[in-house]
C-alpha cells in the first residue's frame, strides 16, 4: 500500500489541476482550423494506418483571395488512428493570391490566423500573419509550440499585394 505524504498531496493536486487547465485551454483557446485536405502521400506503410505527409489549404478568414497551403507529417499506427499520436513539428507553408483581394476589415500588424492541434493536448501548429507595410505584402509564418517548450522549426511565405491595393491596419 502506498501512502501519500501530506506535504506531497498539495503538489500532486496542483499537478492534476494544472494538467486539467491545460487540457481545457487547448480545447477552448486553440480555434478549430478549417482545413481542406488537398492531398497526401504515404511515407511508411502500417496495417493500422500509414504515416503520411498531408497538404491542407487554409483560406485567410480576413483576407479573401489568399490561401495558405501547409504540408505536415501525420503519424499513423494505432495512436494516429485513435487521434492520440503526437505529430512531428516540421511544417512547410506556401501562401498565394488565388482570387481578387478583399479585406473583411482592418488587420492587426501581427495576428495568429490558424491553429491546429498536433497532439491530444499539448502541441499546436500556428500560422501567424504579419503585415509588411513597407513592401505592401502579407507575410505568413508557421511554427509549432508545446505547453512546456516550442520549436524553432518554422517556414515563411509572403503574398505581395497588387499595385494600388493598400492593406488596412488597425
Task: Locate the predicted segments by residue.
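N-terminal export/targeting and maturation segments
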Residues: 35-76
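C-terminal segment of classical bacterial N-terminal signal peptides
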Residues: 18-32
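Basic/polar N-terminal segments that are highly enriched at the extreme N-terminus
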Residues: 1-5, 31-36
Amino acid at each position: 500500500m502506498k501512502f501519500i505524504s501530506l506535504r506531497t498531496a498539495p503538489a500532486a493536486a496542483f499537478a492534476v489541476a494544472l494538467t486539467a487547465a491545460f487540457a481545457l485551454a487547448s480545447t477552448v483557446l486553440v480555434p478549430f482550423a478549417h482545413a481542406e485536405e488537398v492531398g497526401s502521400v504515404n511515407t511508411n506503410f502500417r496495417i493500422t494506418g500509414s504515416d503520411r505527409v498531408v497538404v491542407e489549404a487554409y483560406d485567410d478568414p480576413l483576407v479573401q483571395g489568399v490561401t495558405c497551403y501547409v504540408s505536415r507529417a501525420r503519424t499513423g499506427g494505432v495512436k494516429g488512428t485513435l487521434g492520440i499520436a503526437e505529430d512531428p513539428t516540421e511544417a512547410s507553408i506556401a501562401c498565394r493570391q488565388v482570387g481578387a483581394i478583399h479585406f473583411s476589415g482592418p488587420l492587426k500588424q501581427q495576428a495568429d490566423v490558424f491553429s491546429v492541434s498536433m497532439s491530444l493536448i499539448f502541441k499546436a501548429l500556428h500560422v501567424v500573419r504579419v503585415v509588411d507595410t513597407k513592401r505592401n505584402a502579407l507575410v505568413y509564418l508557421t511554427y509549432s509550440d508545446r505547453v512546456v517548450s516550442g520549436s524553432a522549426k518554422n517556414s515563411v511565405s509572403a503574398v505581395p499585394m497588387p499595385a494600388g491595393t493598400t492593406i488596412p491596419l488597425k
